[in-house]
C-alpha cells in the first residue's frame, strides 16, 4: 500500500501557510506498508525521512498493539471467556467496551499536565510500558495459579481495565504527539494502516486461538493467549521507541490557576463547541456494533452448537473485514474526510443487525463477523479523523480528553443497556433491533455536522 506523499506545513500568526504541501495519490494494494514517496525539495525543520520514519513507526506501533489485543479479541474471545468462567450477563455485556472506557477515564484529569509539556515522548513511553505489564502478570497468574478458580474471573476482567486506566494517563499526550507528527490529510491513511497491520496479525490470531483452545482448553489456554498478547504489545512499545518527536509550530501554555478552576472551566469550554456536543451524541448512538457483539459469539455458538475453539474462525474473518474496511476508509477518508465514513459505517450496522437476526448457519455467522470487522473499522477511522479535525489546535489536548471522558459513559451506558435488555428478556433479537435504531438516529445527528475539510476549502 502506497500512502499519500506529504510535506510539512508551517503556521505563522494563526494562519496556515502551505510550504509546498503536496499529496500524492492514495493507492491501495494488498501489502500493508510500502515506502512513502518523497518529492520534497525545500529545506524543512525536520528532514522528510524523519517524518516518513515516524509515520511508519506510528503504523507499526498501533498494528502490533491492536494485533496483540486480537488474541484476546474484546468483541469475540472475551465474552465467551467470561461466560465460561461464570460471569453474569452484565459483565459479558461490557467486555467489548471495558478497555476503551478505561482508556478514556484518566485523560481528562491529566490533560492540564499534558498541555504544559514541551516533549511528549518520555511521558508516552513511560506509561506505555506500564500499561502493557498487566497482560504479562495475568498470563503468569493464570499459568501458575491452577488451584485458584475464585481468582480467574477477576483476573480476566480486571486485566484490560487496569491496562486501560494506566494507558489513559498517557493517551492524551500520545494523541497530541501523533496529531503533530501526521499531517491532516493523511491521518485517515495512518489510522487505516494501523488497523490493516492489526488485521493481518489478527487473521493469524484466529488460527492460533483455535489451536490453543483445542489443545489447552480453559485456564492454561487463557494463560497462553495473555502471554502471546503481551509479546506483541512489547513489540508495539519497541516500535514507538524509534520515533523522533517533532516540535510544534505553536505551543499553548494554559494560564496558571488552581486545578479546581481548571475543572470548573471544562463545561463552558465544551459548551462553546456545539459540533463537539453533536459528536458526543453521534458516538453514543453509534454504539450499535458493541451492543450486538457482546452477545453475538454466545448466540452464534449456541445456535450452531459449535465448540468454543471455533470462535477462532470468527476472529479470522472479522480481521479480513477489518483489512478491506480499513483500505476503503484510507481511500475515502483521504478524499472526503471522516464524516462520510461514520455515515457509511452506520448504514452497514443496520444491515449487520438484520443479518444476525435471520441467519442460523455457521457460515452465515462467519459472514456476519466479516461485516462486523468491515463496518466497525470504518467507524473507528472515521471517528479518529473527524475528531482530530473538529478540535481547535490550541485546546486540542483538553477537548479530546473531554470527548474521551464523555465516551466512557457512552460506552458503558450503551453496552449496559444492551446487557439489561438481554438479561431481562433473554432475547438477542431485541438487542439487535435496538442497535439498528441507534444507528439510524446517529445518521440523523451526523447530518447536522459539517465536514471540516469542506469548510476549510471554502474559507
Pin down the residues of each PLM region.
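Helix-loop boundary and gating motifs at the non-cytosolic
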Residues: 25-105, 131, 275-315
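Multi-pass alpha-helical transporter architecture, strongest
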Residues: 32, 141-143, 232-244, 433-459
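MFS-fold secondary transporters
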Residues: 137-138, 163, 240, 355-356, ...
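Helix-loop junctions at membrane interfaces in 12-TM secondary transporters
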Residues: 140-158, 357-368
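C-terminal transmembrane helical hairpin of 12-TM major facilitator-type secondary transporters
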Residues: 340-380
Amino acid at each position: 500500500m502506497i500512502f499519500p506523499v506529504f510535506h510539512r506545513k508551517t503556521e505563522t500568526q494563526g494562519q496556515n501557510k502551505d510550504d509546498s504541501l503536496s499529496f500524492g495519490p492514495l493507492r491501495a494494494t494488498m501489502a500493508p506498508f510500502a515506502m512513502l514517496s518523497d518529492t520534497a525539495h525545500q529545506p524543512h525543520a525536520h528532514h522528510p525521512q524523519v517524518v516518513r520514519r515516524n509515520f511508519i513507526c506510528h503504523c507499526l506501533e498501533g498494528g502490533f498493539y491492536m494485533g496483540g489485543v486480537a488474541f484476546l479479541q474484546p468483541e469475540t474471545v472475551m465474552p465467551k471467556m467470561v461466560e465460561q468462567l461464570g460471569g453474569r450477563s452484565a459483565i459479558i455485556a461490557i467486555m467489548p467496551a471495558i478497555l476503551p472506557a478505561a482508556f478514556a477515564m484518566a485523560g481528562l484529569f491529566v490533560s492540564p499536565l499534558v498541555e504544559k509539556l514541551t516533549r511528549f515522548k518520555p511521558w508516552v513511553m513511560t506509561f506505555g510500558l506500564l500499561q502493557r505489564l498487566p497482560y504479562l502478570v495475568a498470563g503468569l497468574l493464570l499459568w501458575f495459579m491452577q488451584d485458584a478458580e475464585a481468582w480467574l474471573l477477576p483476573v480476566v476482567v480486571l486485566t484490560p481495565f487496569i491496562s486501560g486506566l494506566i494507558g489513559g494517563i498517557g493517551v492524551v499526550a500520545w494523541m497530541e504527539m501523533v496529531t503533530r507528527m501526521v499531517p491532516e490529510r493523511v491521518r485517515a491513511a495512518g489510522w487505516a494502516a494501523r488497523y490493516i497491520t492489526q488485521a493481518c496479525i489478527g487473521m493469524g490470531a484466529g488460527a492460533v486461538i483455535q489451536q490453543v483452545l483445542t489443545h489447552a482448553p480453559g485456564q492454561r489456554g487463557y494463560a497462553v493467549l495473555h502471554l502471546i498478547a503481551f509479546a506483541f504489545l512489547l513489540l508495539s512499545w519497541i516500535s514507538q521507541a524509534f520515533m523522533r518527536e517533532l516540535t510544534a509550530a505553536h505551543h499553548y501554555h494554559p494560564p496558571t490557576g488552581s486545578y479546581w478552576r481548571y475543572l470548573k472551566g471544562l463545561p463552558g469550554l465544551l459548551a462553546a463547541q456545539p459540533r463537539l456536543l453533536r459528536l458526543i451524541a453521534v458516538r453514543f448512538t453509534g454504539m450499535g456494533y458493541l451492543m450486538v457483539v457482546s452477545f453475538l459469539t454466545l448466540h452464534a455458538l449456541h445456535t450452531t452448537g459449535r465448540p468454543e475453539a471455533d470462535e477462532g474462525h470468527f476472529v479470522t474473518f472479522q480481521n479480513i473485514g477489518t483489512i478491506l474496511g480499513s483500505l476503503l476508509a484510507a481511500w475515502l477518508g483521504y478524499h472526503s474526510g471522516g464524516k462520510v465514513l461514520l455515515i457509511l459505517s452506520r448504514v452497514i450496522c443496520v444491515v449487520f443487525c438484520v443479518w444476525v437476526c435471520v441467519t442460523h448457519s455457521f457460515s452465515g455467522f462467519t459472514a456476519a463477523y466479516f461485516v462486523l470487522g468491515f463496518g466497525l473499522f470504518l467507524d473507528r477511522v472515521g471517528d479518529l479523523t473527524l475528531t482530530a479535525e473538529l478540535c481547535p489546535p490550541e485546546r486540542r489536548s483538553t477537548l479530546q480528553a473531554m470527548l474521551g471522558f464523555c465516551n466512557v459513559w457512552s460506552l458503558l451506558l450503551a453496552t449496559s443497556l444492551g446487557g439489561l435488555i438481554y438479561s431481562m428478556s433473554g432475547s438477542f433479537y431485541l438487542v439487535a433491533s435496538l442497535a439498528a435504531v441507534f444507528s439510524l438516529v446517529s445518521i440523523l445527528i451526523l447530518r447536522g455536522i459539517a465536514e471540516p475539510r469542506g469548510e476549510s476549502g471554502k474559507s
